[in-house]
């Protein structure tokens, strides 16, 4: 019989680690870093020891890690894994874009530091160490094995780890190319959902897929992020419609959103086109993720995921001052945004905050990273337009009702949340 151990995730959101094994083989689903305010904060040294303790405690002849998606709370401990690691093609590309862009920024900063009239040697050494660590992470990511997402209606190709068979199924989440897993071995069938939702553009067909393939399930391992919240998630399409109303009312629109969430960027793209504004960006990271999404998904949804943004520089200011704009930004762009805000009339300018409101409302989140709250406070006009990247309570009930699993294990949830 296959056995399951939830090392982390039963009483916290994020930082999930699930182990499934037989006599000869085992797989881990996700090895995630703890989120601020969820689980005990740890140092890199503590993370390395914790991973080693888990890995060495139940070693098998055949073993591997499978990542549901590329969010840090699911993939963040990858540097400490010494055997095969698998992730979707899109997930691997996103992670490489992230770390290569970070490396490029650190290298530029290091060169500037070295060219100063009186070089800051301690800062130069710090940046050198950052570059070295980031290169090591990139080298590690390059070794990741991947699977190719299948077309709608096609059965994905299973991956064998000893006598355990893992089949990845594409799902909708707030990051590109997320997957669920069917895990089979010794006559049993387990289904691990990872993070998912039923209200995005890419969730079409998701329940049909579950009805067709998630049959005779012995154990369902499902996320439960929204279990303690009674509100029903609005659709991604509704997000876009609400953005259109705001973009018609204001000439200069900044949208704070994740650069890795293809569907949210698609909502912004659609609203921007409908209101005939130029789509603008300030970040090389956003530029590169949009290029990835356009290359891989640009022919879907009548161009919903085909992006042609303008990269903002001062040379564009006069043109954009006349035409207005939609500017996709992140919390780390505060200085650039503030400089532009000082040149714009505040009564015609607004921030659409399109991220989780806990980043600026919850004390533990603000203590961990105050940039979201500080970013909002730069604007006179702010509106929240957002929907969750996670499945709501009603949709979880629907999934359980469709599968009729013999057992349900709920992870990625608050400690007091119950099905």
Language model features with spans:
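His/Asp/Glu-rich metal-coordinating catalytic cores
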Residues: 2-66, 73-263, 267-274, 278-282, ...
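Histidine-centered active-site/metal-ligand motif
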Residues: 69-74, 173, 192, 386-393, ...
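Mobile, glycine- and charge-enriched loop segments
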Residues: 346-352, 360-389
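Hard-cation-handling environments
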Residues: 229-352, 377, 395, 401-404, ...
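Internal alpha/beta domain cores that form substrate/cofactor-binding pockets in large enzymes
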Residues: 359, 382-419
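Conserved catalytic alpha/beta cores of large enzymes that bind or transform nucleotide phosphates
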Residues: 219-232, 380-386, 390-394
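Short, charged/polar "capping" segments at the starts of alpha-helices
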Residues: 37, 93-96, 263, 286-291, ...
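Short acidic, S/G/P-rich loop/turn micro-motifs used as interaction or catalytic elements
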Residues: 35, 227-228, 262, 332-337, ...
């Amino acid at each position: 019989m296959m056995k399951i151990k939830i090392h982390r995730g039963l009483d916290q959101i994020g930082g999930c680690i699930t182990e499934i094994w037989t006599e000869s083989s085992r797989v881990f689903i996700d090895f995630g870093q703890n989120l601020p305010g969820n689980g005990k904060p740890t140092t890199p040294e503590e993370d390395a020891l914790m991973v080693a303790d888990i890995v060495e405690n139940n070693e098998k002849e055949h073993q591997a890690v499978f990542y549901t998606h590329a969010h840090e709370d699911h993939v963040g401990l990858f540097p400490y894994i010494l055997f095969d690691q698998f992730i979707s093609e899109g997930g691997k590309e996103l992670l490489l874009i992230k770390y290569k862009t970070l490396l490029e920024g650190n290298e530029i900063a290091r060169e500037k530091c070295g060219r100063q009239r009186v070089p800051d040697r301690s800062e130069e050494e710090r940046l050198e160490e950052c570059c070295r660590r980031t290169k090591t992470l990139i080298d590690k990511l390059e070794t990741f094995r991947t699977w190719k997402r299948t077309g709608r209606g096609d059965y994905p190709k299973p991956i064998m780890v000893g006598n355990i068979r893992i089949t990845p199924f594409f799902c909708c989440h707030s990051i590109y190319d997320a997957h669920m897993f069917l895990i089979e071995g010794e006559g049993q069938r387990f289904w691990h959902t990872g993070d998912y939702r039923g209200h995005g553009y890419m969730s079409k067909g998701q329940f049909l897929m579950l009805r067709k393939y998630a049959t005779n399930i012995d154990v369902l391992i499902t996320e439960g992020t929204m279990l303690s919240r009674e509100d029903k998630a609005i659709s991604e399409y509704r997000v876009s419609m609400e953005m259109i109303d705001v973009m018609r009312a204001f000439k200069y629109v900044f949208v704070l959103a994740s650069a890795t969430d293809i569907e949210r960027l698609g909502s912004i793209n659609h609203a921007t086109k409908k209101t005939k504004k130029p789509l603008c960006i300030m970040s090389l990271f956003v530029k590169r993720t949009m290029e990835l999404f356009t290359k891989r998904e640009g022919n879907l949804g009548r161009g919903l995921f085909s992006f042609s943004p303008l990269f903002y520089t001062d040379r564009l200011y006069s043109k954009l001052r006349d035409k207005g704009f939609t500017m996709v930004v992140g919390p780390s762009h505060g200085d650039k945004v503030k400089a532009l805000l000082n040149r714009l009339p505040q009564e015609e300018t607004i921030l659409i905050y399109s991220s989780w409101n806990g980043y600026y409302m919850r004390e533990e989140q603000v203590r961990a990273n105050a940039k979201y709250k500080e970013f909002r406070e730069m604007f006179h006009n702010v509106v929240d337009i957002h929907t969750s990247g996670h499945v709501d309570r009603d949709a979880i009930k629907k999934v359980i009702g469709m599968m009729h699993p013999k057992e349900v294990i709920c992870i990625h949830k608050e400690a007091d949340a119950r099905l």
